[in-house]
Amino acid sequence: MTRDQAREKVIFALDSSEFAHVQYWAETLSDRVGMFKVGKQLFTACGPATVRMIQKFGGEVFLDLKFHDIPNTVAMASLEAARLGVKLFNLHALGGYEMMARTVEALDKEFKGGERAKVLAVTILTSSTEETLRQVGIESPVEEMVVRLATLARKAGIDGVVASPREIPLIREACGPDFLIVTPGVRPAFAALNDQKRVMTPAEAVRAGGDYLVIGRPIGDAPDPAGAAEMILDEIMAG
């Protein structure tokens, strides 16, 4: 794997609500990561201008808003996300088949088969455990729910999923090699686990078949963020 190929796999999570931070990170990391993740906090605070700022510096965007509502509302919100020119955005697979299928239908109609944002379905959050699921009435094991939701998403026409790296082999077996897998459960050897339970190192996640790796605090909290990003690329390349 080349360094450019490794770089394309890394998505830096912008864990901030300050617009000035967006410009700083876009300038600092645009040549060291493949994409920037804009989540709920940042997008709520700063809006679409966040996406445009990243694009101004040549960066690609993963809009991580995890849409989950009635089908028409999610489809219309998804159109607005795609019109911003983001590369990836997501919704919750727990919203069901109709919600996901209506979203894909709306996007295909809008973009008429041309290039558009890829839609990802969130399966089970990486902070969740089987006890967490039982507390909300889901008795199935985490792995079983992940595969069930990923399969449902693929059937609805969704482009891929967001899932823990430890579920990658199960998803690959159920959904095939062309189904995108984006994993936030990644921590390099030099970083603490924080609040995510089901994790792997970047090299392990890539070996397992992950297409994109979402990494935030191990880069953003490092004394030398650019250096931390380079260390992660080194680890991916070393395999």
Swiss-Prot record:
Source organism superkingdom: Bacteria
InterPro entries according to UniProt: Aldolase_TIM, OMPdecase, OMPdecase_AS, OMPdecase_bac, OMPdeCOase_dom, RibuloseP-bd_barrel
E.C. no: 4.1.1.23
Pathway: Pyrimidine metabolism; UMP biosynthesis via de novo pathway; UMP from orotate: step 2/2
Keyword field: Decarboxylase, Lyase, Pyrimidine biosynthesis
Coiled coil: none
Active-site residues, record numbering mapped to chain: K66
Catalytic class of the enzyme: lyase
Glycoprotein recorded as keyword: no
Cited NCBIfam families: PRK00230.1 (NF001273), pyrF (TIGR01740)
HAMAP family reported for this sequence: OMPdecase_type1_B (MF_01200_B)
Biological function: Catalyzes the decarboxylation of orotidine 5'-monophosphate (OMP) to uridine 5'-monophosphate (UMP).
Oligomer and partners: Homodimer.
Protein name: Orotidine 5'-phosphate decarboxylase
Organism field: Geobacter sulfurreducens (strain ATCC 51573 / DSM 12127 / PCA)
Encoding gene per record: pyrF
